[in-house]
């Protein structure tokens, strides 16, 4: 994280790729992996000078035996120089603005990422703009002048984005300033910023221009766009149009106590085997929750219509489901709300709520309330509360879903009687729905008994003795669990003669809790947050204890891993500072699957989910180096992905898996 510059912003994260791309270097450069070169990439926070000093003292004292006092003095000098540099930049921005006023010049704020200052990347765009007689400023040089009205429609959680929004807000107040945003291919976070910056400017009558640049050194298209902008500005000047400067803040619709009584709450599907149990749990608490059943192709098509197409593939699926349901005509939209979860982390998933609100506004339904379900206090609604009863019902449902998934996927490929595994699942599903759908406080004794009985019944299901390759499925959480997003990969693997192994959904929640340990130890988070989250982990493990013990005693199942063990397995390949997206947890899952004998792994990599490319695809080389028998394939999922290409790559992995299995058996 950065030092907080804007107190009203939601958070102050750094870019997820800036925080983690060094891991790709560490795990893929031969000179480093072979030990020829020393490579240090400690995770550090620029929250304040003390937090930064502590990390650098630990690093340089351990690696180079530099005295603590010397390191702290160096950090202090660097911190002062950083503040001075920023101040000089702001003064220069004010000088340029004054020059524009005195010489009646126009200015262009060239807003981009820090690397866009590099001539090799911007291809000379600043010089081209000045050749037209205009001044060029960076967003950093004027962001301190923009008194941005908050809250925004987006989650303002990345520090660099906060500067972009503030700079755009200042530009809208001046007739002699315009803004051009530079956007590089693959920068998925700019799917959030480009929309928000555009809104800030266009709502106040300004023209928004975005230039997409990549490694191609051809400025023809950029020159045309800039000349078009200048022509449009001249036309507006001749018309002497008066602009109304509008505030940038967004007033969200609150979900009230009255709404709770008769509103239908639409929640997007993520994991059918879990969510079909969560629905009755929420209804028992008085919420009319519905999960729309939307075909996969329709999800994508509708998502592309309502979401910035540079956004990640999971966001298209989520918003596509919601908007398909909203536009279906099945619901009274005057009594409809949307429910979405937010982790509060640096992943763009925290901004899905902004995507949803923008899509609803675009479709003409801005009055539909969007409810955030989160544990970090991001948004609150009087009509939706996580009561102890709802938490109990929901967690029981989640744990039952994990048991069903673990048991069903393990026995179904080997069932002696076709359909018997699904029939057993349906039988127990009805009992679980009746149990978690009870409006009273649930019996923990009965819950424990049901967990044990489910595992025993699946363990005793008649199974064949054949051996099939076990294939783990990991990746981004939605693509991993949602069949519509992963093209029904579990069904595909089973039809091709393999057994699918999908890690528990609860593990992701434990990963979110465990992250507080690293944050408290190295990134300046409070010891209190660490204690609270470790208590939550112990609570989750208490809930899972009976299931874990029964799985350990069974003939066919492995017990669930402890989150601490996953972290220990992962941290020799990636740092536990990787906490964006699935972070170190994704690497840990792959290593745990290999330890359990599922050496064949499909790693689902959705479009624009760049952090997962670092901790997923980016660690495959190192995992193969440590485990030569690992058979891992990374499968890309995006709106235009060819299912044939995905199928071919999976079949190639399976053919290798079958060969390896024959060698093992022989």
Question: Model-derived features: where do they sit?
Answer:
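An N-terminal assembly and electron-transfer interface module characteristic of large anaerobic redox
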Residues: 1-666
């Amino acid at each position: 994280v950065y030092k907080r510059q804007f107190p009203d912003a939601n958070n102050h994260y750094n870019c997820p790729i800036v925080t983690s791309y060094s891991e790709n270097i560490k795990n893929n450069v031969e000179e480093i992996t072979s030990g020829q070169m020393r490579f240090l990439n400690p995770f550090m926070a620029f929250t304040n000078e003390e937090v930064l000093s502590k990390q650098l003292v630990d690093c340089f004292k351990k690696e180079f035996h530099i005295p603590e006092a010397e390191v702290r003095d160096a950090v202090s000098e660097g911190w002062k120089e950083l503040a001075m540099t920023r101040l000089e930049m702001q003064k220069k921005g004010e000088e340029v603005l004054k020059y524009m006023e005195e010489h009646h010049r126009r200015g262009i704020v060239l807003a981009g990422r820090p690397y866009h200052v590099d001539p090799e990347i911007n291809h000379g765009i600043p010089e081209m703009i000045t050749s037209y007689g205009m001044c060029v400023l960076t967003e950093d040089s004027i962001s301190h002048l923009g008194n941005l009205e908050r809250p925004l429609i987006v989650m303002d959680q990345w520090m660099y984005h906060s500067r972009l929004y503030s700079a755009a807000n200042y530009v809208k107040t001046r007739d002699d300033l315009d803004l051009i945003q530079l956007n590089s291919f693959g920068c998925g976070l700019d799917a959030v910023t480009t929309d928000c910056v555009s809104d800030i400017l266009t709502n106040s009558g300004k023209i928004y221009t975005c230039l997409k640049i990549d490694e191609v050194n051809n400025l023809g298209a950029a020159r045309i766009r800039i000349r078009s902008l200048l022509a449009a500005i001249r036309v507006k000047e001749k018309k002497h149009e008066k602009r109304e400067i509008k505030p940038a803040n967004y007033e969200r619709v609150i979900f009230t106590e009255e709404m709770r009584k008769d509103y239908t709450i639409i929640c997007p599907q993520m994991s059918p085997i879990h969510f079909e149990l969560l629905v009755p749990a929420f209804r028992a608490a008085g919420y009319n929750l519905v999960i729309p059943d939307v075909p996969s192709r329709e999800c994508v098509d509708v998502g592309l219509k309502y979401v910035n197409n540079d956004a990640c593939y999971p966001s298209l699926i989520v918003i596509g489901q919601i908007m398909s349901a909203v536009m279906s005509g099945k619901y009274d939209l005057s009594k409809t709300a949307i429910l979405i979860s937010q982790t509060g982390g640096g992943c763009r998933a925290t901004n899905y709520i902004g995507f949803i609100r923008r899509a609803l506004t675009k479709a003409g339904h801005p009055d539909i309330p969007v409810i955030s379900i989160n544990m970090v206090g991001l948004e609150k609604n009087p009509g939706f509360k996580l009561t102890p009863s709802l938490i109990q019902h929901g967690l029981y449902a989640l744990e039952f879903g994990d048991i069903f998934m673990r048991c069903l996927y393990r026995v179904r490929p080997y069932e002696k009687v076709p359909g018997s595994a699904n029939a057993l699942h349906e039988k127990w599903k009805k009992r679980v729905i009746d149990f978690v759908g009870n409006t009273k406080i649930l019996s923990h004794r009965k819950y424990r008994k049901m967990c044990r009985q489910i595992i025993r019944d699946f363990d005793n299901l008649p199974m064949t003795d054949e051996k099939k390759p076990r294939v783990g499925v990991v990746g981004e959480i939605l693509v991993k669990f949602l069949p519509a997003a992963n093209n029904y990969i579990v069904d595909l693997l089973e039809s091709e003669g393999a057994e699918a192994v999908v890690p528990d959904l609860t593990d992701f929640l434990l990963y979110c809790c465990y992250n507080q340990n690293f944050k408290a130890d190295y990134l300046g988070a409070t010891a209190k947050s660490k204690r609270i989250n470790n208590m939550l982990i112990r609570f989750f493990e208490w809930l899972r204890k009976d299931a874990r013990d029964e799985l350990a005693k069974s003939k066919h199942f492995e017990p669930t891993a402890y989150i601490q063990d996953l972290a220990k397995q992962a941290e020799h390949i990636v740092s536990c500072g990787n906490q964006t997206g699935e972070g170190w947890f994704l690497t840990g899952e792959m290593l745990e699957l290999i330890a359990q004998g599922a050496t064949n792994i499909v790693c689902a990599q959705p479009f624009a989910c760049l952090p997962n490319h670092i901790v997923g695809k980016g660690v495959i080389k190192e995992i193969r180096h440590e485990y030569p028998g690992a058979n891992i394939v990374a499968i890309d999922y995006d709106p235009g992905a060819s299912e044939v290409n995905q199928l071919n790559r999976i079949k190639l992995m399976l053919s290798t898996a079958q060969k390896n299995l024959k060698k093992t058996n022989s």
